[in-house]
Regions:
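N-terminal amphipathic/basic-hydrophobic helices that include classical n-h-c signal peptides
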Residues: 1-11
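N-terminal Rossmann-like NAD(P)+-binding domain of SDR-like oxidoreductases, especially those catalyzing
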Residues: 9-191
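C-terminal substrate-binding subdomain of Rossmann-fold SDR/epimerase-dehydratase oxidoreductases
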Residues: 10, 215-330
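A structural alpha-helix within SAM-dependent methyltransferase catalytic domains
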Residues: 41, 124-128, 174, 212, ...
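Active-site loop immediately N-terminal to the catalytic Tyr-X3-Lys motif
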Residues: 108-109, 200-201, 250
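NAD(P)-dependent short-chain dehydrogenase/reductase
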Residues: 148, 161, 171-231, 236-241, ...
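Short glycine/proline- and charge-enriched loop/turn segments
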Residues: 149-156, 194, 284-286, 299-302
Length: 330
């Protein structure tokens, strides 16, 4: 969904392949951030990359093979000008903002909203003079409970403080884009992402990771009764590709990144059994959560039109690729 503003006749990937682009990736040691960082390094081998991460939800091991710079700072207190100098002189082509407190079970409202929102505000204040392109992680959690595919124009209904912080970030992005129509700010609502380099997250790691670990150990996979809750499970390689495609967006906007398909947890366990060579039946238990998304699915119409985003991995293909990475053949 466009945020407003006029087209910017600008193609990042076309204009930077002949030069040495400069990118910042906040949260670049985290799950999605590290996958994005290494993909940018592969796509733009001459790029100057700078990762900013405080390791609160990241791990240095995720950046094996990384050749760029690294800044260990808390974004909620980072003085961007002191660290990088005048934004016009710094000359960054784009800032990918993926850093945030992502644990939806955290109940400290001040910490989560302050860190997520103020980090974003500080980043925008630094980027504003040069109108550096911003590509930031919003979230499908902003939609709250849904019964059908979520469209970007749907009203926000955050069910937890994490989702609320992302709604506020979206509001701030809309305001900044409206004030500066030639400044490209792209928000990406990632759906239920899974894939390599998420293990360090612990409890907030994807259900695909946790269920695979249970099944690999020979245990029945434990899911809420009766396994018919559905998710738009999207492989991290697809959301990374969508994030890079945002470098070519001609207007500001907020877009869904998922597969466009909702699959049940029972279906997921069938897929895992096939990939792992197991035959384990689910162990169902009561859902203790009062606010729980029983259904998520991305409407990809806007992302296809604006970003030319097209997911490549079905649940079967993504889980197979992930299991081969997670449990390599000996």
């Amino acid at each position: 969904m466009p945020l407003g503003g006029r087209p910017a006749n600008f193609s990042m990937t076309k204009t930077t392949t002949a030069s040495r682009p400069k990118f910042i990736i906040t949260g670049g040691a985290g799950f999605i951030g590290s996958n994005l960082t290494l993909a940018l390094q592969d796509k733009f081998p001459d790029a100057h990359l700078t990762v900013i991460d405080d390791f609160r939800s990241g791990n240095f091991k995720n950046l094996a093979g990384y050749r760029g710079d690294f800044v260990a700072e808390n974004l909620a207190t980072l003085d961007w000008r002191e660290k990088f100098g005048d934004p016009a002189a710094a000359g960054f082509d784009a800032i990918f903002h993926l850093a945030s407190i992502t644990d939806t079970t955290l109940h400290d409202q001040f910490v989560q909203v302050h860190d997520n929102v103020e980090s974003f505000r500080r980043l925008l204040n630094f980027a504003r003079p040069r109108k550096t392109r911003i590509i930031y992680a919003s979230s499908a959690a902003t939609y709250g409970p849904a019964a059908e595919a979520s469209v970007e124009s749907d009203g926000a209904a955050p069910a937890n403080v994490y989702a609320f912080s992302k709604v506020i970030m979206d509001n701030i992005a809309r305001g900044a884009a409206a004030e500066s129509p030639d400044w490209i700010i792209v928000g990406l609502r990632y759906f239920n992402v899974y894939g390599p380099c998420e293990a360090h997250k612990g409890v907030p790691a994807s259900m695909i990771y946790h269920l695979a670990q249970q099944m690999k150990a020979g245990n029945r996979p434990r899911i809420f009764k009766h396994g018919e809750q559905k998710r738009d499970f999207v492989y991290v390689k697809d959301v990374v590709e969508g994030s890079i495609l945002a470098l070519d967006a001609n207007t500001s906007g907020i877009y869904n990144l998922g597969t466009g398909q909702a699959r049940s947890f029972n279906e997921l366990i069938d897929v895992l059994n096939k990939c792992l060579g197991t035959n384990l039946q689910p162990e169902y238990f009561d859902n203790p959560h009062a606010h729980y998304q029983n259904f998520t699915q991305a409407d990809l119409t806007s992302a296809r039109n604006a970003l030319r985003y097209e997911p490549r991995f079905s649940l079967e293909d993504g889980v197979r690729d992930y299991m081969q990475w997670l449990y390599p053949a000996k």
